[in-house]
Amino acid sequence: MTEKLFYKDSHLSKFDAEVLSCVRAKRQQVKDSFGRLDGKAGEYYEIELDRTAFFPEGGGQYADTGVLYMADDDTCGLDETARKKVQVLDVRERNGRIFHITDGFIEAKTAVKGSIDWEERFMKMQQHTGEHIVSGLIHAAYGYNNVGFHLGSEDCTMDFDGEITEEELRRIEAEANKAVWKNLKVFT
């Protein structure tokens, strides 16, 4: 089973790992809810690592993206930008195992350095925390439960089991902003 570093440190953006397996991805495995990876079968690979900080798609949230660098390729001492790398385009979890959908092959037992697209991850963290704040305020004020949540690259939506008026929504927004301005510690 893959060690899930994102549960230990949600701010971790770089990590070391070893490739456990790398196989060609099946066509249905390389399409996400946005249709991002709609290429032909065989163009993408599923890489399983012994540990990862890449958060997989789930819970209404799309997967992290980023890069896997070959750790043993120092390319004459140059930085990561000059190293051999593959793009991590999607991440899926199946039966406790996490698979990174990439645009290139990496041999099993290869040491890699993972680098998460931090700007994207941080944006998702903020939106996810905001969803919890808004949902909690709506539940406390009106008793409605959050029955659906979607965090996408362009928007964030929440579904509740009751109607919320424009006036009520403005009040909730003001209360949510107050909570953010207080800069309270977030526990995960």
What is each residue range found by the language model?
Residues 1-188:
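A glycine- and charged-residue-rich anion-binding loop/surface
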